[in-house]
Amino acid sequence: MNIKIDKKDDVILKILHYFITEEDYKPIIINGLENEIWLENMQSDLKLIRINTNYIHNEEQLKTDMYKAQSIMRSIKKSTFSFRMNMLNLLLDTGEKVKVMDTKNIETIKVDEISDFKKNKVVKEFFPKVSNAELTDQVDPIEFFKLTEDMNQKTIKNEKKLAKIFSQKKPVITYALIVLNIMVYLFMVLYDVDGTYFYALANNYEFVQNGQIYRLLTSMFLHSDIIHIACNMYALYILGPQVERYYGKTKFLLIYLLSGLLGSIFSCAFMSADTISIGASGAIFGLLGSIAYFTYYYRATLQGLLRSQVVPVILLNLAIGFMVPGIDISGHIGGLIGGILVSMGIGIGDKGRKADQINGIIVFILMTLAMLYMVFVK
């Protein structure tokens, strides 16, 4: 039996296969579109790929098509909380006299043959691997089905990775931190009636400046009363398992401790000499920051979650800190910033661009040094 493959379908499949299997793009479902395929990779310089198979017979129709593409791109940019978004627009069926035009943030090319795609200078600039890709103009039914199977396997592999990240795991480190905080609190209540240990471990500007740096860490495990520890441990019980599941046990512990430490340094930098600061709030705000980074990183998958849920929760908690007396708002802000930067620096699973991780580490170090300068020098 002879199977005939349409030339245009062959070109579409080869382009899709390349972007999905080699460049880690994923399809986007956009309602109301016909003869268009949209792909996304939020870690790429060209975050969107559009493959348009509609026939464009003149430049007026091209302008209308470009306007539609820009409108959809703006909508995706807004829903994914992206500050900058560039797109590659591939036109597979245009009239001979139609001259393509580039618009702001959109690179447009005409593709009649797969060689047009492979040899295009824009494609080679953004996707250097395309030069070595096996992309030929020959239409082969056997290859057609092989490429389809490759894409299916890649999709299954990606789904398994996501399932592993979002699967339920026993939050051992979270429970250990809760137990440790409660044990420290009970010790202080039962055996430190006069507050000797309490004041020896609390965060205080003058004592830290005089060399008692350990206070920046020990103060994270002290709480003033039952309401204070109950609120913090409840927040840790809610947020901790999520972060531990998303990042893994070791990375979760790093996020908790380092963001809490930066929160303590922020607190110390802005407190008066007669003030003490205690509590796990800085570390807990660090967990909020790590969740914010995670939802931003997977913003295409978790559509709208960052904007509709995570950011409002963070803003509400910060607002409470500003309005209620006695709350160490500087520690909360420091912890939040620390959580975002540490999460960025350590990355999520085996994903993440090295440049982002390096930037996260560098900015965290610079932020820490700047706050330490305020504590010890200024």
Question: Which residues does each predicted region cover?
Answer:
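Residue-level signature of the transmembrane alpha-helical core
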Residues: 182, 257-261, 283, 288, ...
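N-terminal signal-anchor transmembrane helix
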Residues: 40-216, 305, 350-362, 372-378
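Terminal transmembrane helical module of multi-pass membrane proteins
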Residues: 317-348, 361-370
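N-terminal pre-first-transmembrane soluble regions of secretory-pathway and organelle membrane proteins
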Residues: 1-52, 108-112
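Cytoplasmic-side transmembrane-helix entry/capping segments in multi-pass membrane proteins
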Residues: 250-255, 280-283, 304-311, 357-360
